[in-house]
Amino acid sequence: ITVTGINDDPVAQNDVGVILEDSTLTVANSANANVSGSYDATGEHSGDVIDTSSSSHTDSDPDDSATLTVTQIKKDGGSNSAVSSGSSYNSSGTSVTGTYGTLTIGADGSYSYAADQSAADDLDKDDQVTDVFTYTLSDGTETTTANITITVIGINDTPTAVNDTDSVTEDERVTKTAVQDDVLNDDSDVDDSAVLTVSNISHTNGNSGTVSSSTTHLT
């Protein structure tokens, strides 16, 4: 009995990554992103969508001599873009812009995802959204596809305070409160549900009057 080999289809596994809204996720160290979706203190993972090591979360091909490459990439609902042969994420990689950031991937399976903070700024702290990309894996003859899902986690953004001015006649008094007199009206916070409050008031006496303050009032 002579058994003649055929070209078997490659097997692509879905990959995941988790990132903070102001960070960059680089996956390029031959160890796929943690399938549980955990992340380190900087909001980063390292790894590669192509990894033929002992990891259970890898792309593979039953054919011993098959060389796997990424040939196409697209965002969810988008059209495929070709990935240049011999490329890596940081050398001739192909970039695709998703909803919350841009993914750059190479033929070797390495990729980098840079969050677009302007797109994710309205996320409150610990809010989560996802960007999904589909890559095509080839062994030179057959192809298959899998997803890269990036979870973007919101952070608490710094509020923006705007200087306020007022005037008073020489024999009168003016008192301002944060809500009543709109001290906060021109201040802002990009986080959707942020509630702005005045936590401290300090003052300096001028040459023409005196100033007194509490945590809520300025007179």
Predicted regions and their residues:
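Acidic, turn/loop-rich segments in luminal/extracellular domains of secretory-pathway
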Residues: 1-5, 84-154, 206-219
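Extracellular ectodomain surface segments
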Residues: 8-96, 160-213
